[in-house]
Every structure is written in structure tokens, then in C-alpha cells.
């Protein structure tokens, strides 16, 4: 059965992870994983290194980022499902740095995600408003 972790942070999530891309891809290859995703916190800095390492190992790379939402104390994970999604993802994350900085933290407005949703998959946690609604039986 195929399985992919969507919440992996790499060494590019400086305060959050020490996972090195080379070791990550090597472990995934040894485990015969067909795909591998990264979702560093509020950035896409690892994209090129990760993408090349995955292709060299014969693994499908999935690019994402875990981002903070405005007026919310939780995060969502945004994944690019195709090239258009990758362009939209880079735009959303960049906009957080340019227009959404709050005390040095890039914050994403939900409208930015809706406006650039094509090709972007949004994963909510159980702590988000969407997750809480589902847990309480009100999807």
C-alpha cells in the first residue's frame, strides 16, 4: 500500500527540524516509497534541492508549505498538485512575506488561498476551525 507523509519539515524549517534532504530521500528510497512530500514552515527554500534529489532517486516529489492563517492560531498545509498549483503556492507563500508579516512571521489570508486555489490542495488540522467543525459533527 502506498503511503506519503505530508507534514515533513526539513533543515529549511530552521527552528523546527534537522531533517536533511539527502538523508530523507535516501531513507524513502530504501523504504521503496513512490512519492515524498515536504511542507516546510512558511517557506519553499528546499524546493530545488528536494526536487532534484527525488528525481535522481526515482521518487515523485510533492512540494508544499505549512503556513499560518490570519486571525487563527493554527496552520494549514498547502500542497502543489501540478505546475499551476506550484506557481500559486509560491505566490501565496511570497505574499505572506511581502504583505502579511506580523512580528516577523508571514501570515496568510484565507482570501489569498481562495484566489489562487487552482492546483493547490489544502490540509486542515484538527485544531483548525474546519477540523473542529468536523469533529463536532458539523462539516
What is the role of each PLM region?
Residues 1-139:
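Phosphodiester-processing cores and adjacent nucleic acid-binding clamps
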